[in-house]
């Protein structure tokens, strides 16, 4: 994403009664960096939420009902480079004004190969399975403007790259959301099965078309939320892992130091020549049959969390976390996922369950299959109380 300058006028309004969660509002304006003129019809939204608005003709906007926490603010207009920045309701800046820059027309030569002809017919199924998913929710979704997708297949590296010049408009009839997804990148490597995609997403709740449809949506949303990474991160933030139905096993690989010691002193050439006692020989051979590493399980995960001054939580770990979830009352069977860090880093969790950096966590198991767009729930979603 192109770099842009930031200078937008923002006012924070905190409101709410003690019996209700505190919410905030954000106001400001957007103008053209070259002319200084206000820009109307600009999309202003908090990434991953249903909180968004558009600017008026005078460039002004007002975004209300923001729950406490940290968010990525996205400001997007056709013909301009997108703007994004991290905001936290506890530390919002004041007296700022956003200026957007005209987007330069860049040649697509960097793709090396031209768009695949009949790209959707050739690669649409692959893209759908890894982007939208393969479950029941995915089968109830449609991409309204799939013609904006561009597919590039690189034969030498066996890699599929997909891009979109406009936000994807996705209708999720299973969960009752209309979604705008601004695709940042999508690539799938057929040689090793490695998938990478990211983007910004904005949700709009759909209007029911028949009696009872809202109840169906609410039930489906609750189920999707309970089985999600967002639910796990919120539970971890609140220290309610067990109460929310999760269990965690933290597995750490530790080297077999005794095997390393025996390797250093054991010489197969003198074994059986009388230079080593039979008891020692049996012991050495037993140790050498052991694995190079032992896996230790750590059940105390509370000590991994650090409370930060801005109300976020941070955690870092080595090894592999196995996360399980089940809810018998709602008919959700046992599922198991694992997560590990792709590089040494600290994962930062917001109160709403969002976390960063996204690319630092590698998921395997259930979440590797279900954390797709068809199962996405807004970060500002509030589930009903569990029975």
Task: Describe the role of every protein-language-model region.
Residues 42-46, 73, 112:
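Hydrophobic beta-strand segments
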Residues 46, 74-86:
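A short, solvent-exposed loop/turn motif at the edges and junctions
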Residues 99-387:
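Surface-exposed, low-complexity/disordered segments
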Residues 24-26, 33-48:
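Short, ordered, surface-exposed loop/turn motifs in non-cytosolic proteins
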Residues 26-32, 59-61, 98, 110:
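A short, amphipathic beta-strand motif
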Residues 37-40, 62-70, 384-386:
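Short Pro-Gly-centered beta-turn/loop motif in secreted/extracellular proteins
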Residues 53, 81-96:
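Structured interaction patches on ligand/partner-binding surfaces of diverse proteins
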Residues 49-60:
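Short, acidic Ser/Thr/Gly-rich low-complexity loop/linker segments typical of extracellular
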């Amino acid at each position: 994403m192109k770099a842009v300058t930031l200078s937008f006028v923002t006012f924070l309004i905190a409101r709410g009664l003690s019996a209700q969660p505190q919410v905030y509002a954000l106001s400001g304006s957007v103008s053209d960096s070259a002319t200084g003129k206000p820009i109307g019809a600009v999309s202003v939204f908090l990434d991953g939420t249903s909180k968004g608005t558009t600017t008026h003709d005078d460039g002004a906007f007002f975004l209300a009902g923001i729950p406490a926490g940290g968010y990525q603010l996205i400001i997007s207009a056709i013909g301009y480079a997108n703007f994004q920045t991290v905001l936290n309701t506890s530390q919002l800046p004041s007296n700022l004004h956003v200026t957007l820059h005209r987007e330069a027309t860049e040649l697509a030569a960097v793709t090396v190969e031209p768009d695949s002809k009949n790209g959707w017919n050739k690669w649409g199924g692959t893209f759908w399975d890894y982007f939208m998913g393969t479950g029941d929710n995915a089968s109830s979704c449609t991409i309204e403007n799939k013609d904006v997708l561009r597919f590039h297949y690189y034969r030498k590296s066996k890699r599929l790259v997909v891009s979109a010049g406009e936000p994807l408009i996705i209708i999720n009839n299973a969960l009752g959301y209309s979604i705008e997804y601004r695709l940042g990148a999508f690539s799938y490597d057929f040689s090793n099965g490695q998938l990478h995609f990211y983007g910004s997403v904005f949700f709009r709740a759909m209007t029911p078309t028949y009696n009872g449809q809202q109840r169906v949506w609410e039930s489906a949303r609750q189920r999707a939320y309970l089985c999600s990474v967002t639910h796990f991160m919120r539970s971890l933030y609140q220290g309610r892992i067990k109460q929310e139905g999760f269990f965690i096993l933290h597995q750490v690989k530790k080297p077999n130091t005794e095997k390393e010691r025996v390797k250093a002193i054991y010489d197969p050439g003198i074994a059986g020549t009388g230079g080593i006692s039979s008891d020692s020989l049996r012991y050495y051979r037993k140790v050498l049959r052991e694995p190079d590493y032992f896996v230790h399980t750590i059940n105390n995960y509370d000590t991994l969390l650090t409370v930060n001054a801005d109300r976020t939580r941070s955690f870092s770990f080595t090894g592999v976390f196995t996360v399980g979830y089940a809810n018998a009352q709602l008919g959700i069977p046992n599922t198991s996922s694992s997560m590990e860090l792709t590089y040494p880093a600290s994962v930062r969790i917001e109160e709403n369950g969002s976390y960063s950096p996204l690319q630092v966590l590698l998921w395997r198991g259930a979440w590797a299959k279900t954390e797709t767009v068809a199962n996405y729930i807004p970060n500002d979603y509030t589930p009903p109380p569990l029975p």
